[in-house]
Amino acid sequence: GVLYRWRQRSERWRLELLKERIRRDGKVKGTDVLKVDSFLNHQMDVELFAEIGKEFKRRFAGCEINKILTIEASGIGIACVVAQYFHCPVIFAKKTQTKNIAGEVYTSKVESFTHGRVYDIIVAKEFLGPGDKVLLIDDFLANGAALEGLAQLVKDAGAELVGAGIVIEKAFQPGGDRLRAKGLRIEALARVQSMNEETGVTFADD
């Protein structure tokens, strides 16, 4: 009854808080660039991150999770705050362009559409292995290359991939649909349907 309605209200409030912040402080460039560096991935609003963490905890409440995996650099801040609600450590995959990578790491390739280059991401084998139940966390999902690279590391480690928590998904780009079609559970808090410099951001559930 009352408690259920209160919970529903607090859940909606968290999502509205995030969407309102994107509308207010996000800067749209063209039709596909959304800059949220004033609160998400350069300067970070940790109180907002806490609400995001609570929402991911709610969505993955029934899941056993003992590791959170993200990618450097912009995923680290959000992953650390989220991890407090799951009471587990955070691992961040390191980007490297070194050719001679030691054998004590899992490695995967990621194509950066922003920078137009391919790089390797690595995680030390001592931190990820069979028996681990992993939640991926990242700030953005667009083409899905980073998420795919992280998922490959989990697979190579023989660990279980529980799902992915994404703060902002560009729903008009193919990554989310492609990865969901492969069976990955993706929980995206704000799904952007379209954007332009005049009208700003339109969300998928508006």
What is each stretch, according to the model?
Residues C88-V134, G200-D205:
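Short, glycine/charge-rich flexible loops or terminal/linker lids adjacent to PRPP-binding catalytic cores
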Residues P130, D138-D156:
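Active-site/ligand-binding-proximal alpha/beta "capping" segment
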Residues N66, D132, V162:
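Conserved acidic residues
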Residues I65-E72:
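Short glycine-rich phosphate-binding loop at a beta-alpha junction
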Residues Y4-R14, E20-R21, D32, A151-D206:
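PRPP-dependent phosphoribosyltransferase catalytic core
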Residues G77-F86:
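Short Gly/Thr/Asp-enriched flexible loops that form oxyanion-binding sites at enzyme active sites
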Residues Y4-I65:
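Active-site-facing substrate-recognition patch
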